Amino acid sequence: RPGPPWVRVTALGSYREVGRAMHLVTTNESKVLVDCGAKPTNNRSEVQPFFAAPEMLPLDNIDAVVITHAHVDHIGMLPVLFKYGYKGPVYCTQPTRDLMTLLQMDYIKVAQAEGNDPPYSKSDIQECIKHVVDINWGEKTDIAPDIKMTMENAGHILGSSSVYMQIGEGRNEHKLLFSGDIKYEKSWLFDAATVRFNKVDTLVVESTYGGPQSIQPTRQQATQDLQDLIIDTLSRKGKIFCPVFAVGRSQEVMMAIDELFKSEKVTPVTVWLDGMISEATAIHTSHPNYLNKDLRGKMLRGGSENPFNSKWFKQVESREQRESILLDPTPCIVLATSGMMTGGPIVEYFKYWAPEPGNTLCFVGYQASGTLGRRLQDGHSQVPLVDKGQTLICLLYTSPSPRDRG
C-alpha cells in the first residue's frame, strides 16, 4: 500500500503452543512466509496452522517461503500450500531440502498406516521440491522486492538456520531476525548457533525451554544419565525403547550409545533403528560440511571411527521383522519414531514392552502437551491407545531412574 514503509509479523501457529510453526512477514510490497509446520497432537483439528487467516489469502500473493529447518513441526504442512495453488520459491539449506522431503513422505506413510487421510499427496511434495532454492549459510539473497535474507547456523539439527531479514533500505531499513529452533552450545553433531548479527531491530525467538522451570542439563550430564540408564536396564536383562525424532536426536543418541559400547563398560547389544532414522542418518553423511569438525573428521576417515557405521546398529526392514523383535526376549535397545509418540512404530513397542517391569521407556526429547509422550512423562499409569479403531487401556509399571535410587 502507498504511504510510509511498514512491517508486520503475523503469528499463524506455534504461539502459546508447541508445533505448527508459521509466521507471515508483510510489508508495503511483499509477503514472506517463514515455516509451515504441523502440530504434534492426536487432535486432528489442531494439526494445521491457520491457513485461512485473511492475511494469507490469496496464496499467489505470497512472494516466498523460508524454511528454518526440517522438523515436522516446521515443514509438515508445506506441501499443502502447493496443493492449493502456491507457485513461488521455497528457500532453505541443502540438508533441509533433503530431510524435509524424506519426512514429508514419511508423514503420508504414517497417516495412511493409522487409517487417516493425509492432508497432501506425493505429487504435492514433488511440486514443492521443484520450487526449492538452495541457500548457503552467510549468503545474502533477494527473496522479495524489498527483502534481503541471510541464513546462519542455528545449531539445532542438520542444516537448521536462523533467518536474518533486511527489509527496505537506507534510514527506513528494518532488520528482523527469526532465531528458528536454536542450540547455544556445541553438540555431538553441530557447532553452537551463530548469535552475532550486525544489528537486530526485531527478534522473534523460540522459547520451548524458556520457562523458569526449564533448566536443561549439560550435554555431558545428559549423556551420562542416558548411559547410566542403559547400563542399569541391561544389567537386569531388560529392553530400552526410546521415542525419537528421525532427525537430530536419533543421531545424538546413536553417538552416545556408540561411545558407551566402545568403552566396554557394558556388553553391547543390538540397537534397532525403526522409522526413517537410517535414511536421515545417511543424509547427515552426505552433508559433512554442516557437521562439527570432530564428527566430520571421523566420518571422512570412515571405518570404525564413523559412529554411524558401528555393527550394533541395525535397521528394522519390515513389519514382520518388527513383530519378531517384539516377541524376542533378548535384551536390546530400540530407537523408533515418532518422537512424541503421536504415531509411528514406537507405539507398537510401547504396547508390547511397557507393562514389563524390567523394561525402560526412555524419553530423550521434548514432549508437547496433548501427546501420548507427555501423558507418560507426567506420570499417568494408565493411558488409552487406539488399535484398529478400538480404544485399549495400557497399564504401566514405572520404575525409579538410577538417579532416583541415589
Feature locations, PLM:
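Metallo-beta-lactamase
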Residues: T101-S160, N289-P329
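Active-site neighborhood of phospho(di)ester-bond hydrolases with catalytic His/Asp-centered motifs
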Residues: I62-H71, Y91-T93, N153, F178-G180, ...
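Active-site metal-binding loops of divalent metal-dependent hydrolases
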Residues: S14, C36-K39, P95, I157, ...
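Conserved small/polar residues in nucleotide/adenosyl-binding loops
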Residues: Y397-G406
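Pre-active-site segment of Zn-dependent metallo-hydrolases
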Residues: Y15-R20, T27-G88, C92-V132, I182-A193, ...
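Hard-cation-handling environments
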Residues: L229-G238, V244-L372
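Active-site-proximal loop/helix segments of hydrolase catalytic cores
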Residues: G155-S160, Q166-V200, E206-Q216, M341, ...
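Core dinuclear metal-dependent hydrolase active-site scaffold
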Residues: R1-D60, D134-D191, E320-L327, P345-E348
